[in-house]
Amino acid sequence: MNKNTQGKPSGKPVRRDGVDPVLRSRARRRAVQAIYAWQISGGNAQSLIAQFAHEQAREIADLAYFEALMHGVLDNRRDIDEALGPYLDRGIEEVDAIERAVLRLAGYELRYRLDVPYRVVINEAIESAKRFGSEHGHTYVNGVLDRAAVELRKVESGH
């Protein structure tokens, strides 16, 4: 077995820092679903995280990253919404619930997870919007995040 894949559930090469990109993608997809469920139900965030983590444990695989994303988004929602606000064409609560969940997750990663390259954040968000969102939702998500990244990741985006 290749040393880069040994012991990793996805079987794909991992980065030097030990991160398995496939497992992170799964964690992001599940986080989008959990954020969506939280937005719709308005229920207790901690209970939702625990329930979702328990039910989805096999699929998530990178449970620690899923939980970090969930706590990050829920604990910083107002700040994330404010950071995204100037790049939206309407209030955040008026954005379709799936696209809103995708934007909040990506907004969290752009603002707080500087270990994740902004292009990865945007690409993952586009893929989630394509998978779960409306027909053209990914185009909207891409436009918002491209503009937001210029401000939130000035050094990285070269502006």
From Swiss-Prot:
Region Disordered, annotated ranges: 1-20
GO biological process: DNA-templated transcription termination; transcription antitermination
Domain of life (superkingdom): Bacteria
Keyword RNA-binding: yes
Keywords: RNA-binding, Transcription, Transcription antitermination, Transcription regulation
Similarity annotation: Belongs to the NusB family.
HAMAP family linked: NusB (MF_00073)
Protein's recorded name: Transcription antitermination protein NusB
Organism taxonomic ancestry: Bacteria, Pseudomonadati, Pseudomonadota, Gammaproteobacteria, Lysobacterales
